[in-house]
Amino acid sequence: MGKRLLDKLWERHVVTTNENGLDLLYIDLHLVHEVTSPQAFEGLRLTNRTVRRPDLTFATMDHNIPTKDVWNITDRIAKQQLDTLRENCKQFQVPLADIGDEEQGIVHVIGPELGLTQPGKTIVCGDSHTATHGAFGALAFGIGTSEVEHVLATQTLWQRKPKAMGIELKGKLQKGVYAKDIILHLLSKYGVAVGTGYVMEFYGETIGTMEMEERMTLCNMAIEGGAKAGIIAPDEKTFAYVKGRKYAPRDYETFEKKWFELYTDADAIYDLHISIDVTDLAPYVTWGTNPSMGVRIDEKLPEKHDVNDERAFSYMGLIPGQSTYDIPVQHVFIGSCTNSRLSDLEIAASVVKGRKVKEGVRALVVPGSKRVRDAAMQKGLHHIFEEAGFEWREPGCSMCLGMNPDQVPEGEHCASTSNRNFEGRQGKGARTHLVSPAMAAAAALYGHFVDIRKESYDGAISYS
């Protein structure tokens, strides 16, 4: 019987197996940020250990930093975490993309754009959305702080092999429908626990038409379905994306030959299989307090089915049967490790070009990295956004989570391109609606959700 992509990635990294069936995996890349690393580094200090492979470790600052004035850090705890990461990286000789550095940005944005993320690697980070890197045919997953310490000290990690889920995507997306809508559809249909105990492998003709940044969006939110990771077999688009980047292999051709072997064999069998035809998918909007509580833009909100629905409706200030078009939007956030890359900003800019943000709506665009910001500014996207009434910010996690100054006031609604809509995720009492960049941009113009498919935009930007 053939092997799944998961099998090939896993077997290449097993150092040994213990009597309990746990495998000791070698880790090829360890990404670090300021929130989940302080105790891990302190653990090394207390046991008089060093970082085993600083050359396979890379740190950045993203979660806590302000995006309006990056040097004015008024939160004492945030400043302490940033200062601590800076000191830890210096002491343990770990490369750091500090505030203001050209390589700084959200950890799951800079990994791919710097060429650190590569097919065939095992990649970990003390962050649940590490699954993003699986878009490159890497086995990438989030870990806890104690595991961060273990990887720093040994460059290995004890893990139990998950099962493999195949998610086949067939058909062509309509204009105005994106990878974000696919994953929100998957979650709304199958729930937030469908992937528990599995690694999701996305494949099929739809994947072949997607660019790398769309694939990253898919894998990024695999964790929202309970999966250990999301993966996509590398192809020519993957190789073209990696080639020439700063940390890409110097002996690129040799590595590329090995990467061509990373696919699921034709006679391999998944432990669970799901097939989705994307042809008739519509843009999605979440209405509740987990990512599975979502509906098509052309559907009404569902009826209450259980106590969780009742609590969600109450928290969100919505009612069953309400039209999605009637959901008010006071804030718009375009950013996060899900949708803050150049193509995301280009799509949003194409929607708002020559138009104005609705009075009373606060709209933020936060590039995922310094390089994304610079590239967008070279194309004049910042002018398009600012002329429309958006705030153009510095890179960081920003309004994705309430750990920095960018927060949504209590009781107000935010159209967000991020990945989580839990109670209080964007601030105490904040009401989060997950959508694509195009849908978020359109909501900023109207002050409520609209069907982006009916808007006259071409999905691309003219720079003339």
Curated annotation (Swiss-Prot):
Q: In which pathway does it act?
A: Amino-acid biosynthesis; L-leucine biosynthesis; L-leucine from 3-methyl-2-oxobutanoate: step 2/4
Query: Is the keyword Aminoacyl-tRNA synthetase in the record?
Result: no
Q: Which domain of life is it from?
A: Bacteria
The cofactor required is: [4Fe-4S] cluster
Q: Which Gene3D superfamilies match?
A: Aconitase, domain 3
UniProt similarity note: Belongs to the aconitase/IPM isomerase family. LeuC type 1 subfamily.
Kindly give the NCBIfam families that the UniProt entry links to this protein.
leuC, PRK05478.1, PRK12466.1
According to UniProt, the name of this protein is: 3-isopropylmalate dehydratase large subunit
Q: Which organism is it from?
A: Bacillus anthracis
User: What are the top taxonomic ranks of the organism?
Assistant: Bacteria, Bacillati, Bacillota, Bacilli, Bacillales
Coding gene? leuC
